[in-house]
């Protein structure tokens, strides 16, 4: 790929994430990429909406040089859920049990742009996200703001950057009408 000029967009930028949807990678049967964007996804209700604590989703992406001409890309998705309970144990177990085969995630950023994380044009679905860590704590006092919280980390290393969804699919995700997402009701 040749270097091309890059034009900066003068527009409002909003930090943070608005949504997180996670799928076992085997449940997503087809992903189509057109001009560097996800243009089609097949997998009936493959992605499950994960309702997290407000402002707790954080997606970090980075890359670094490997050897003379290679790069490794890293994705880390952190989120928290407050109040440990039985349903939370079900999520914990599902993420742990699904990690050997891996996950794909849709992260909707603060600008309402959705990204497919755990999939890249180079690796396809061979370098998915896995549960890196989960840890919880009750806190010691009633006044601890971060007490009784469980924190999760999904992460991967792969050979390419996460890809954005095209305008049509992005609109469906934001409207809550994407056929491949099982939304909360």
Spans of features found by a protein language model:
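Generic "edge-of-domain/loop-turn" microfeature
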Residues: 27, 38, 84-86, 112, ...
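Solvent-exposed edge beta-strands and adjacent loop segments
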Residues: 2-78, 126-144
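Short, acidic/charged, Gly/Pro-enriched secondary-structure junctions
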Residues: 93-121
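Mixed-charge, glycine-accented linear interaction segment located at domain edges/termini
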Residues: 124-185
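Composition- and surface-driven signal marking solvent-exposed, interaction-prone regions
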Residues: 92-94, 168-169
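A general structural signal for short secondary-structure junctions and capping/turn motifs
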Residues: 68-70, 94-97, 107, 142-146
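Oligomerization/assembly interface segments of phage tail-like spikes and tubes
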Residues: 64-89, 145-160
């Amino acid at each position: 790929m040749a270097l091309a000029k890059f034009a900066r967009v003068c527009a409002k930028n909003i930090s943070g994430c608005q949504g997180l949807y996670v799928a076992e990678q085997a449940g997503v049967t087809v992903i189509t990429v057109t001009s560097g964007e996800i243009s089609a996804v097949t997998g009936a209700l493959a992605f499950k909406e994960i309702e997290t604590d407000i402002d707790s989703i954080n997606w970090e992406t980075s890359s670094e040089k490997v050897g003379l001409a290679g790069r490794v890309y890293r994705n880390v998705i952190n989120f928290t859920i407050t109040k440990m309970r039985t349903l939370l144990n079900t999520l914990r177990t599902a993420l742990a049990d699904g990690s050997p085969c891996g996950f794909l995630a849709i992260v909707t950023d603060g600008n309402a742009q959705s990204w497919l994380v755990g999939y890249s044009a180079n690796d396809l679905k061979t370098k998915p996200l896995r549960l890196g860590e989960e840890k919880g704590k009750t806190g010691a006092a009633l006044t601890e703001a971060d007490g009784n919280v469980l924190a999760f980390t999904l992460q991967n290393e792969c050979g390419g950057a996460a890809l954005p969804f095209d305008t049509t699919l992005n609109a469906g995700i934001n409207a809550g009408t994407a056929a491949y997402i099982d939304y909360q009701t």
